[in-house]
From Swiss-Prot:
Principal subcellular localization: cytoplasm
Entry EC number(s): 2.1.1.199
A single MF term (Gene Ontology): rRNA (cytosine-N4-)-methyltransferase activity
PANTHER family given in the database record: 12S RRNA N4-METHYLCYTIDINE METHYLTRANSFERASE, S-ADENOSYL-METHYLTRANSFERASE MRAW
InterPro entries, sorted: RsmH, SAM-dep_MeTrfase_MraW_recog, SAM-dependent_MTases_sf
Lineage: Bacteria, Bacillati, Cyanobacteriota, Cyanophyceae, Synechococcales
Gene name of this polypeptide: rsmH
Protein's recorded name: Ribosomal RNA small subunit methyltransferase H
Amino acid sequence: MQTDLSDSSFFNHKSVMTDEIMASLEHYPLIHNNQLKGIDATLGGGGHSFNLLRKYSELNIIGLDQDPFARISASKKLDEFKNRIDIRASNFADFVPKEKVSFVIADLGVNSNQIDDPKRGFSFQKDGPLDMRMNPLLEVDAEKLIEALNEKDLANLIYKYGDERLSRKIARKIKLDLKENGKYSGTKELAYSIAGCFPPKQRYKKIHPATRTFQALRIAVNKEIEVLEKFLQAVPEWLLPGGIISIISFHSLEDRLVKSSFKNDQRLKNLTKKPITPSEQEVEFNKRARSGKLRIAQLK
């Protein structure tokens, strides 16, 4: 069963660290210039772009997103600014701007609607197909991925992207299940099988035992690390002199890449030796913000 593209009512993503993103752009010396242009590399529901377009009346933004559901929702949210927002169907790693811009913002990782819509297959809280594709046009979903990989490669993937110490045991169980029973019925069955690899006392902790494995599969399906590396290499070329790049990451693999890029890229001046984290008030209001880390750099 597919999600109806005409219905974006389920898309209720809360953008993270919006105040901090706004403040980061004040580092740009011409932020109040009448010809201000920027790129929202992960448009999502349009929350960050909405706040920026509302604050800067002369600002024009190009909004990128590979998820068609996000683009539909964002276009509705940003309708009052339709003359100043240009929404593109693109992964940020594949985009090449025609002209340089004043800033680029990126809010990485899975968004709330992708998690909350069971038909997208990102979560085991509600049963859904083993999908996990941010772009529904990708050929390989999570189901095809676990079928295609051998046990060793699956274990390595779960360990590399999920930092899961029981990766070998989990991979062995997944491949055994597939051999004996065929495909999993959905996300809940896979999560239940993974949980069975843990000692009983570890199965009912605050963090579900399948969480790290699901993260690893999602990262692999969407090639999140590869596309981030490509983006980080390209993005300084998108900026005008003094331009700002602000990136929010949500897990250690992403944050290490962003930190290293901002520190070692000779084209950039790193403006955040330590990442900016969400306020206590925001985390209380939006629990999913708690792992967010914002890093900022400026083109020299």
